[in-house]
UniProtKB/Swiss-Prot annotation:
Belongs to the PhyH family. Dioxygenase; part of the gene cluster that mediates the biosynthesis of loline alkaloids, potent insecticidal agents composed of a pyrrolizidine ring system and an uncommon ether bridge linking carbons 2 and 7. Lolines are structurally differentiated by the various modifications of the L-amino group and include norloline, loline, N-methylloline, N-acetylloline, N-acetylnorloline, and N-formylloline. The gene is lolE1. SUPFAM superfamilies: Clavaminate synthase-like (SSF51197). This is Dioxygenase lolE1. It comes from the Eukaryota.
């Protein structure tokens, strides 16, 4: 199986209206058409979960919680897994995103978030500050590999928060005063569902309190097609400033 290669039929006018109003869109597998076999997607992710700490290739990030050293994320996948490259950077996701936003896009970050049992949550935040030096505007596709539930720490959004000037405190978190009275809505997903959201969505995650993994594949896309090499610059910078567990020596030009 390969990722879907025929042009995406597009999203509905209602989908576009919902996305513009709320800042996110949830699509089931039969609607998004990014792949045709969930079992194959899960097999690809199973393969990647076995990748070791090799040098100069993919990048593993870990977290320590309750005395356990847990795989948190694996980035820079596409060079080493052709089906995953097609899934994230092929015609289907780019056509889907253009149908939703009217814009052409280029991928600049690719990863799997593992969210293993016991994995940590995240305080309310925006993704924009972390990447704004590279892309002031971007959009993310999250593909649920496993079920995403309240119990295992699914994403929670404040709908419509992308329209607000959300204040960010010095530590990078959303200012506590803004959070007063805000309702975070859980993004409960079935395996194979897709969640699309933009850089300015206020969101949080709870810890995974179950004995089951809650993995997802992420593609992050910017809108400036005059910078097709932005992904290379991003990962060169990230290697220097946020090195992975399998840190290695690469010939890179640090982007500071």
């Amino acid at each position: 199986m390969t990722a879907a290669s025929s042009p995406h039929p597009g999203v509905s006018a209602e989908d576009i209206e919902f996305y513009q109003a709320n800042g996110y869109l949830r699509l089931p597998q039969e609607a998004h058409g990014l792949f045709d076999d969930l079992a194959k997607l899960q097999a690809w992710v199973a393969e990647i979960s076995q990748w070791g700490l090799e040098t100069g290739k993919w990048r593993h990030y870990y977290e320590t919680t309750n005395g356990k050293h847990l795989l948190w994320g694996t980035e820079k996948l596409m060079e080493y897994h052709a089906p995953m490259r097609d899934l994230i950077a092929g015609e289907a996701p780019l056509t889907l995103l253009k149908s939703l936003t009217g814009k052409d896009m280029v991928v600049f970050k690719d990863e799997i978030g593992w969210k293993l049992p016991g994995g940590k949550g995240a305080v309310p935040h925006l993704d924009r500050p972390a990447y704004s030096m590279f892309a002031p505007e971007f959009i993310e596709i999250m593909i649920a590999v496993d079920a995403h539930t309240v119990e295992n720490g699914c994403l929670q959004f404040v709908p419509g928060s992308h329209k607000e000037a959300v204040p960010i405190s010095a530590d990078g978190r959303i200012a506590s005063a803004w959070l007063e009275g805000k309702e975070f809505i859980p993004m409960v997903l079935d395996p194979g569902d897709v969640l699309i959201f933009n850089e300015s969505m206020a969101h949080r995650l709870d810890p995974n309190k179950t004995d089951q993994r809650r993995a997802a594949v992420f593609g992050t896309y910017h809108f400036d097609r005059s910078q097709p090499d932005l992904r290379d610059k991003f990962y060169a910078h990230r290697l220097i400033h946020s090195p992975p567990e399998n840190a290695w020596v690469e010939t890179v030009e640090a982007q500071t």
